[in-house]
Every structure is written in C-alpha cells, then in structure tokens.
C-alpha cells in the first residue's frame, strides 16, 4: 500500500523434547533400576552397646515409564515496514514445560519411602513474554542521515506443579510463584538494647543475638524466628524481567556520531554475602565502616548491623532478608563514538562503558560484589585507506 511496504504475520507451534534427566536436581543415573544399600542403616545392641547390625536400605526406587521433559512452544510474531523508514518486529512467546523429573515430595514417609522418595515426571513450569525491536532510518538530505534503533524484552515464568508436600503455612509453597524470586526474612530494623531482645521473639539463627543485630518479623506468630518465617520478599531475582537497549547513529557530511544504551528492570540484588557479612572473614569495606551499628554509634537506623571478630559471631545478620535487598535496575551508557572522514581515511574517538545510572550505588549492578569491575575505556584512532 501507500504506507505499508511490508507486512508479515508469523506463527508457530510445536512439541519438543529436552534431554534434562534430573541430574542437576539430584537424580541418579539408571533411574529405571532400584538402588539398594546393604550397609547404610542399622541398630546397635549388646550389653556394652558395641555390636551393630546393618540391614538393606532402598536409597532410590525405580522410575516406571520415565520419559523426556517436554515443551509445548507457541510463537506469534509480526514484521512490519512503514513509509520506507520504519521497521517493527514484535513477538509473543509462550512455553509450557511439563514431564519435568522431580522428587515426589507430596508422598509421606509413612508409606515406607523414608529417604527414597520416588522420582516422577510430575513437574510443570510456564514461561511467556514479548520481544520488540524498532528501527527508524531517514535520509533528510544527501548530507544528513539518521538511524534510531531500540529493543525491548519482557519475560515471566512460574511453577505450575512441583508436587510439594502440604506445608503448615501457605507462604512456604513455590507453586504459582516465579522461578527467579527472592525469599527471606522480613527485617524490622536493628535491636537497640538487650531489653528489646528479651521482649522479642527468640532468634536462633546461628549466633547469640546482641544489640545491633537485625530484628526479624515473626510471621507465623509462634514466638520464635526460624525457617517457617521466611517468605517471598520480592517476586524478582537476579534475572531481570525487563531488558532493553536504545541506540542512535547520525551522519552529517564528513562527521559521524553513534551512541548505545542498554539496561534492565524488575530485578533484585541481595548484598548479604558481602564481606564481612559472608562466610569468609575479610577486611571491612569502607562503606560499611562509615555507617555500622556500634556502642559508640547506637543508631537503630544505621545502614549496617554490628560487626564481629568472625562471621560465626554475626550469623544472625547474614541470612537473606529485606535488610539486604536492593533495587537492581540500571541504565548503562554502553558506547559512544565520534568520527571524521577525510580523503585518505577516518579519525575517531570512542568510549566503552561510559557510565551507569542506577539506584544501586555500591558496585556495578550487573556484577557481584567480589567480581572484577568492568573497565571504562577510551580510544583515539586513525583508519587509513591506500
């Protein structure tokens, strides 16, 4: 037509298999065979309790009619070109993964399974999302050419069936929740005194609770803080729901200019593993030393809890909680290039990893705290033609 240069509507649907055999989830090889240990369990008897009798123990029951993990895939897309300038590509995808091999956690031990809960193709997971790319290019004059491009991706997933046991609290279930989510305790600030500790639910999380430690919410109201009080504190995890990019190239006479930005959103960063609040006893980072709770700084709103000589003395503060949860969204000024063409070549200036804009300020939001940082680089060069 006068305005539409090209229009294509695409669609596909198929059933594919996956060779994932459950090894990553703890399954063993040769699942079609019962596995029995002859010296794994027993009892001790005798006058002096010095005689032990061992008996057989089934460690893995054979999987009957086990099969491949399967995926039903649907993709609907459109390719559109308008005004000989604008190109749009959009896709919607939906994947229903089933027959996932997992432990039958819903089977009670009273049926005689003990530690050998059977494996079965019961798991189900859904994935869906959209992808969009747009490119606009226009030659205004013989001296001026502009090219804009952008891309956007949004994805979601959730557990549909995990054959979970019957939990005493509904918030412990994973069914219906995202795969990449953040689970932990709900923090309620820092303890300011021993009196406050004595009048609060008991916290037995690996170390003796002292003033300056993190206080957690007793979600189930049983007077103690334990694994039953862990909830989904964010529907997002380290894998972002949204990823995007935006770039531009401009040519004017002998000059050329280009930039590109990329970023992600709906992403959570947990910083509870940073030193000295991780599993290793390293030096204190400067931003922690600047604002942590201490007897000389008994600020209940300090950014970081009290310190200890070893990580075992502060185990209460190292568990995952909202205290350590941060917004991991960011926009990165990825590349910049400016060039000038002359008769025998081109001279240029470019840069990579120019800047990062994010509410998270401690380190590069794309990296972990102990990773080597991305380098910011600038180059000046000359390209010669002979």
Label each region the model flagged.
Residues 35-61, 175-237, 286-322:
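Flexible glycine-rich, low-complexity coil/linker segments exposed to the extracellular/periplasmic environment
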Residues 103-106, 225-227, 275-277:
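Conserved active-site-proximal loop/helix segments of enzymes involved in bacterial cell-wall
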Residues 1-180, 320-386:
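Extracellular/periplasmic, surface-exposed regions of secreted and cell-surface proteins
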